Amino acid sequence: MKKIILAVMMLIGTSTAFAGDSEPLKAILKAQNYAEAANLVQSTLDQLAGNEEKAKAYNRLYELAMKKVNYEEGIQLENETQKQMGKEGNKPVDEKGLYAAVGAAFNSGVEAIKYDNMPNQKGKVKPKYAALVESVYKLRNDLINGGVYYQGKDDKMAYKYLAEYVESAGYPEFASF
């Protein structure tokens, strides 16, 4: 009887040990802004349990960066709509922040896709973020806009965005496009 109880206790103990996310991943998923999450990912990347957790962490970075992108693009759209209606759209757009967020979202999305397509701890590839590929691919157009925005202002940044656009055409993550 003692052996059965001991075996059941060991089974419960091992199943709970492997059931949830690691502590570093939980901290990354709780982060409320991109800078905080990026620092956590950078400092704890080697502590994440496997490729699935790394993909989850980079997906969280992508989501946080896209909040800024969507917010600023919403303001741009609202300003354009106001102009078309004959009113003055005068809400300020943080273009520098927008394109920084575009770059961060693109890079985080590519990393999430990369880790998502790597074998898990069992040696099997089970992509969970397949829908992310199309969303990240669409950000390539914003890389061009970022390069154009920085032309004449900051040549290094302009080159960075335009070069990223050109180089990303050959990324294996985007082979289906």
Predicted regions and their residues:
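Alpha-solenoid helical repeat scaffolds
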Residues: 42, 107-110, 160-166
